[in-house]
């Protein structure tokens, strides 16, 4: 009926698929098992749907189940599902779910697992993700670490979105980095997270920055975290 009334409208349908959560348990109550999703995908295409968006089912009050934090789901955990759906339909298929680097996104497209990459939390961390890739500056993309602290936790606490890796997020009107009135030589003592961020902002404002760090590695207390759980997670 939508196609009849608005023939030029592009209809994108989110295909909510449940994923395993231990033995005989699944994330995303109310979603579709993969076998049913495959049948439904073909029916949706036949009905005139233009694109399918493969994602974690999210009919639940626990957002941690459906927007998984670091270490709770592998990277690209929905890609195998989108690949299966793409094999069954001829319309474009998009996928989302812990695809956090340009390299990972490119691999999904290259191996035929999806036609489009959906970005959620990654755009809070770096709103210029796509622009940087288009300009050939993929190495400058700031990577979301999936901590869920500024985004998902804030949603559940009825607060506005923010990001622990992007201090401007949510404060774009008051925290814009603008050129300084006069250029100074600035020394930053300590190359921990705070020191590195201070150095980055100062440099963007046009100052000449020198960082002093007593150890052989930068990162500060982050280096301690790397020795604990989820050491394969991005930082």
Segments predicted by a language model, with ranges:
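Residue-level detector of conserved catalytic or cofactor/ligand-binding positions
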Residues: 229-235
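Flavin-dependent oxidoreductase catalytic cores
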Residues: 1-189, 193-209, 217, 223
